[in-house]
Amino acid sequence: MGKVYDWFEERLEIQAIADDISSKYVPPHVNIFYCFGGIVFTCFLVQVATGFAMTFYYRPSVVDAFASVEYIMTSVNFGWLIRSIHRWSASMMVMMMVLHVFRVYLTGGFKKPRELTWVTGVILAVVTVSFGVTGYSLPWDQVGFWACKIVTGVPAAVPVVGPPLVLVLRGGESVGQSTLTRFYSAHTFVLPLAAAVLMLTHFLMIRKQGISGPL
């Protein structure tokens, strides 16, 4: 085992990376309220794992979507548990995100030189809410359908660009298969990719600048 480690150490300098991570200074004022961001990230990982598991059975079709969700809940081994964890962690992710934003704001973590960290965090908050909006409609039940119809209709109030934006979101004049396909694509590919890139950027800036000091 030692030879295997030495082989990787010689090429990747694993120990130097581990020492750099473990030796990072943590200010003494940091307390449990500074854990909200880490909890959001943990919830995101749970979402990815449980969401990926459900893609094996979910069908993004207006005809089969509800039946496939019902199948996951009633027939797939532990399917009810996986979907329930997905829902619970989604709620937890949003709640922890809100608390994290409040904590950063109240402790002045958005001030110079951390403005860009704050900006990426705000964009991540928008992405998180978008996860909820797109995922809410995927079962394509009555609640999901009308929620989708209302959400995609909101931009119509924006002058000039509003109506074309509605067409892009819905994939046509009315809510239907094209809308569900767009929401599914956004929920399972576009938003996770955007969140991963933004989180990496967010973490690298925190790593570079450190945790803000006490007020």
Swiss-Prot record:
Biological process terms in GO annotation: photosynthesis; respiratory electron transport chain
Give the record's membrane topology.
Multi-pass membrane protein
Q: Where in the cell is it found?
A: Plastid, Chloroplast thylakoid membrane
What are the binding positions for heme b 1 in this chain?
100, 202
Keyword annotations? Chloroplast, Electron transport, Heme, Iron, Membrane, Metal-binding, Photosynthesis, Plastid, Thylakoid, Transmembrane, Transmembrane helix, Transport
Enumerate the GO terms in the molecular function aspect. Answer: electron transporter, transferring electrons within cytochrome b6/f complex of photosystem II activity; metal ion binding; oxidoreductase activity
**Which annotated residues bind heme c?**
35
Residues given in the record as heme b 2 binding sites:
86, 187
Aminoacyl-tRNA synthetase found in the keyword field = no
Which PROSITE patterns does the UniProt record give? CYTB_NTER
Any note on cofactor binding?
Answer: Binds 2 heme b groups non-covalently with two histidine residues as axial ligands.
Regions that span the bilayer:
32-52, 90-110, 116-136, 186-206
Q: Which cofactors does this gene product need?
A: heme b; heme c
The record's InterPro entries line, in alphabetical order, gives: Cyt_b/b6_N, Cyt_B6_PetB, Cytb/b6-like_sf, Cytochrome_b_N_euk/bac, Di-haem_cyt_TM
NCBIfam families from the UniProt entry: PRK03735.1 (NF002990)
* More info: Heme 1 (or BH or b566) is high-potential and absorbs at about 566 nm, and heme 2 (or BL or b562) is low-potential and absorbs at about 562 nm.
Q: What does this protein do?
A: Component of the cytochrome b6-f complex, which mediates electron transfer between photosystem II (PSII) and photosystem I (PSI), cyclic electron flow around PSI, and state transitions.
How would you summarize the oligomeric state and partners of this protein? The 4 large subunits of the cytochrome b6-f complex are cytochrome b6, subunit IV (17 kDa polypeptide, PetD), cytochrome f and the Rieske protein, while the 4 small subunits are PetG, PetL, PetM and PetN. The complex functions as a dimer.
Q: What is this protein called?
A: Cytochrome b6
Its taxonomic path starts at: Eukaryota, Sar, Stramenopiles, Ochrophyta, Bacillariophyta
* Gene from which this protein is expressed: petB
